[in-house]
Every structure is written in C-alpha cells, then in structure tokens.
C-alpha cells in the first residue's frame, strides 16, 4: 500500500496530539458525519472508547458458535420466532444496521478506512441488540488524502494511501471478509439457513446506507458516493474469495400495475427474500420481492387448518 505525502506517523513535535485527543477528535468527526442519516439510523453511532453502563459484546466472542447461537436465539425471541434461520438472518440485519453506516460513511465522506474486522470491534447493545459499534484499535486505520477534510493532521489519523480503490479494498476486506463472512458461515452451520439469503440481507443493509444518504442529503451524491456504491454492488466478481460477489445487485426494479388505476409504477424490491414474512405477525418488509404476489404469500403463511377451513367454506357456498 503506497504512502502519500509525509512518512506515515511523522509530524513535527509541536503538531502532535495525544492519543486521547486524537480519539476524541476523530470520534466527534465520525459522529458528525452520521448526522444526515439520523432520520433512518436513529441509534447508530461509532465509539472509540467504551461508554459507561452499556453492554459491549466483543466481536471476537462471536466466533464461538455457542456464543453466536445464544445471541441469535435471544434476538429471535425479540422478533417473535424460535426459527434460527429467520432469527439468524435478522440478527445479521440488525448488526448491519449498527455496523455498516458508520464504516461506509467514514470511507465515502472522509476517506477514512477503519479496521472493522470482527476481532477489532465491540458491539454496543444498550437495549440488548446491536445499536452502535466501537473500534478497539486505530493503528490499522488508513486515510485517502483527497477525501479527508478533518482538523487533525492526516498523519495522526492513519496511514495515507494513494487510491480510492485501495481504500475500498481495505473496507470491503474488513467488513465483509473478516466480519460478515465468518458470521454467515457459522450461522449456516447451526441453523441451515441459506448463505445466499444471509448475504442478501447484509448487501441490502449495506446498500440502504447509500440510498438513505442520497435521500437525506442529495448534495452528498458525489463522485466518491457513486464510485463506492458501484464498487460494492455492481461488480460481479470480488477478490475476497473465489466465485461471484455475494454483494452484487441487492435490489431490483420491477414494474407493477396499480389494481385500481391500471397505471404502471416502478418499484424497488430486494433481490433476495429476508424470510420475515414467515414470522407469525402477518408482516412483510417494505421491499419484499414477494410483495407483487401478496395473496400467494398470505396463503403460504396460513396454517394447514386455516386452508382447510377456507376450502370447507368455499365448498358449502358453491
């Protein structure tokens, strides 16, 4: 990874800040960058030191299948299901809600690449589920000078790099190669849920950040925004493993016909179902790929007894 400008870590003595000052200034910068997203990501935040009185789950602890299963089981209780397949998919979605926006926005708006590997994060759970993240060690942080506009000297933030491609590769590797991939593998092992479904959930949450940032602050749809989004979701291949990228195309646009007006409307749907319709609460996510077939989904969700009762009533009235 090539360096830009001064040798990484070198600054005249009078320009140096203490580690505490750097952490405080950087945390404030990262929190401020999240401001446009508060309408959708109300609880999301990023910490560089643990707050008092909040449960912090060490990311590395989730590599233990029993510990991970316990977290997934408890999350299933929150959403009303004992099915570990559904609980696993939506626990991953909740983790994505907490983890992805802070890391992605640091990359896109500030040119800062934070090491979000599972071993380097803590997951803050003020209400028993992932809400914020904490970066344990900043020593692996990298910075793209052309995107950075903070008040701290760049060399005290991290190692300068010379290309946006290097920045994206670093972030992709940490987030998806060293965090979500091992979690997906373990959840698949104990629940049997398809990795494709889990990757679909993670990719949707990752792309949701870009869409929300554009809706909340259209002026932030910069070249960096477009390049980063395309690199994450429009490449068929990735270099983290063999085979096609599981992040490719998290959504698709389809035409639907309004049953009352007969007008065609475009609608953005998930490419992969998240399984939430199987939870016995009668709900579907707003971007459900099964939404155009809502009646079919309702029938699938009905119990065998309800279907038999419906057929019996129909026979009597025939």
Locate predicted features.
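Cys/His-clustered metal-coordination modules, chiefly Zn-binding fingers
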Residues: 224-318
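Hydrophobic, aromatic-lined core segments that form the binding pocket/scaffold
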Residues: 66-264
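Serine/threonine-rich low-complexity intrinsically disordered regions
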Residues: 7-12, 18-25, 30, 57-58, ...
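Aromatic-residue detector
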Residues: 37, 55, 107, 133, ...
């Amino acid at each position: 990874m090539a360096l830009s400008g001064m040798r990484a870590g070198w600054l005249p003595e009078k320009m140096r800040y203490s580690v505490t000052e750097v952490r405080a200034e950087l945390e404030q910068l990262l929190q401020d960058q999240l401001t446009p997203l508060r309408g959708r990501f109300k609880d999301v935040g990023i910490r560089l030191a643990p707050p008092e009185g909040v449960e912090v789950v060490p990311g590395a602890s989730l590599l233990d299948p029993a510990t991970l299963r316990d977290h997934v089981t408890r999350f299933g209780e929150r959403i009303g299901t004992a099915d570990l397949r559904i609980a696993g998919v939506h626990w991953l979605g909740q983790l994505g809600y907490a983890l992805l926006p802070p890391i992605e926005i640091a990359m896109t708006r500030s040119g800062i690449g934070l090491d979000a590997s599972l071993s380097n994060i803590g997951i803050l759970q003020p209400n028993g589920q992932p809400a914020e993240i904490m970066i344990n060690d900043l020593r692996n942080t990298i910075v793209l000078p052309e995107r950075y506009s903070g008040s701290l000297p760049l060399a005290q933030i991290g190692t300068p790099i010379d290309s946006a491609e290097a920045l994206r590769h670093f972030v992709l590797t940490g987030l998806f190669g060293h965090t979500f991939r091992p979690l997906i593998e373990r959840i698949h092992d104990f629940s049997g849920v398809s990795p494709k479904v889990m990757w679909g959930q993670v990719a949707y949450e990752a792309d949701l950040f870009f869409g929300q940032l554009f809706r909340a602050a259209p002026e932030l749809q910069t070249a960096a925004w477009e390049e980063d989004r395309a690199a994450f979701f429009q490449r068929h291949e990735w270099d983290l493993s063999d085979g096609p990228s599981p992040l490719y195309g998290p959504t698709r646009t389809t035409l639907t016909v309004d049953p009352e007006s007969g007008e065609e409307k475009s609608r953005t749907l998930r490419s992969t179902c998240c399984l939430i319709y199987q939870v016995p609460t009668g709900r579907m996510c707003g971007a459900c790929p099964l939404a155009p077939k809502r009646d079919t989904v309702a029938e699938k969700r009905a119990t065998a007894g309800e279907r038999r009762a419906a057929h019996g009533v129909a026979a009597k009235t025939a």
